[in-house]
Amino acid sequence: MRALVLLGCLLASLLFSGQAEETEDANEEAPLRDRSHIEKTLMLNEDKPSDDYSAVLQRLRKIYHSSIKPLEQSYKYNELRQHEITDGEITSKPMVLFLGPWSVGKSTMINYLLGLENTRYQLYTGAEPTTSEFTVLMHGPKLKTIEGIVMAADSARSFSPLEKFGQNFLEKLIGIEVPHKLLERVTFVDTPGIIENRKQQERGYPFNDVCQWFIDRADLIFVVFDPTKLDVGLELEMLFRQLKGRESQIRIILNKADNLATQMLMRVYGALFWSLAPLINVTEPPRVYVSSFWPQEYKPDTHQELFLQEEISLLEDLNQVIENRLENKIAFIRQHAIRVRIHALLVDRYLQTYKDKMTFFSDGELVFKDIVEDPDKFYIFKTILAKTNVSKFDLPNREAYKDFFGINPISSFKLLSQQCSYMGGCFLEKIERAITQELPGLLGSLGLGKNPGALNCDKTGCSETPKNRYRKH
């Protein structure tokens, strides 16, 4: 009996190994696509002298620490927006974020762009939900895996603020260093697929908050869809709510397009726009790329030339982000400074109104509660709009200040007029000088303008709304 069992196991083993060999042979025989257009478009093979960005980045850090951060800390801006800027974030490479439902080809697309297929570097892929971690792909001299706890503890990296999401999340965060030329210029972030089944969504950490953290810091966001899975559920709706205000950075990708016939592809393209229309309330829709991002050749009798041109357009978008990394970084810090300035003006106005309404017999808590509950009665926001270079579109939500002052007593703040020193000057004047002169001047030093000093709020406005910084096709 034992001999029969052993014989059966041996036969099964031989059968399985034979199937595995056939599968490997099939994979080896599958024609691979020419990748030369990737290297050409991204200029990976060009021996260009590496630009020395360190001087500009050091100047940017100095402006932030000397002119912006003092006011930011004094008025506890981070507790309103929960976006703390670190030195690692200022000096970091552009970040490209991959989002979308499960098994739509996000990891496969990263493998394809980096040429990691059939190497020990490749990300695991499959038809089932395979990515349960946030995977950060960075450049390194050799293949190296970094635990999330180590990444969060390293202040030199831009991921130290992720520690606030708890140990359960850090166990789902992983960094991979790969010696690849593209990763010398950009960082890729692969994310867990969105699963509409609520029970499967019990991840043990604040998934949406973590996504928001990466969205706020991403320079380019690829939202990937599979043409056979276009269902838009609650989780996907939540994702697009988080993407509001980032429309200029979103690129929608209809992947695996060579699986469909022409007529069906047109129907799917229309269905995708129909499903996403209620979620993207902007005049100009995001760019949609239709292609198949994997190493195998396009299937026969499909629009191969179209798919290739779409892929090249996407690569040009990616290259624009890489080329404009310093310009985008300076613009990001300037937008942050504008928000900090408006927040400080609002807190100062709340405090001034509180002092004006207080009398010897007044109950301070009741007086300030009345101001916070109905700021329009005291013209808080209208007064700020009368200030120079403040747009109504930049004002924060009134409700946000109820929560803000709920944990920060008004008595803990000083008036802006009291935030001055003989040697250091006034906080407000320093941040306004950074917005109108120093940051535009730094931008002009990159050769973008003939008269950098002329770029100020009087001419350009201090709008916080991000412009479309990337070239559309």
Swiss-Prot record:
Family, as annotated: Belongs to the TRAFAC class dynamin-like GTPase superfamily. Dynamin/Fzo/YdjA family.
A GO BP entry: store-operated calcium entry
GO cellular component, as recorded: sarcoplasmic reticulum lumen; sarcoplasmic reticulum membrane
Region (G2 motif): 128-129
Membrane topology: Peripheral membrane protein
PANTHER family associated with the record: SARCALUMENIN, TRANSMEMBRANE GTPASE FZO
PROSITE patterns: G_DYNAMIN_2 (PS51718)
Location of region: G4 motif: 255-258
Species per Swiss-Prot/TrEMBL record: Homo sapiens
The UniProt record lists the keyword Signal: yes
Residue ranges of domain Dynamin-type G in the record: 90-331
Alphabetically ordered keywords of this record: Glycoprotein, Membrane, Sarcoplasmic reticulum, Signal
Protein name: Sarcalumenin
InterPro entries in UniProt: Dynamin_N (IPR045063), EHD_N (IPR031692), G_DYNAMIN_dom (IPR030381), P-loop_NTPase (IPR027417), TRAFAC_Dynamin-like_GTPase (IPR051943)
Post-translational modifications: N-glycosylated.
Keyword RNA-binding attached: no
Signal peptide positions on this chain: 1-20
Residues listed as glycosylation sites in the UniProt record: N281, N389
Region feature (G1 motif): 100-107
GO MF terms, alphabetically ordered: GTP binding
Region (G5 motif) residue spans: 278
Region of interest (G3 motif), residue spans: 190-193
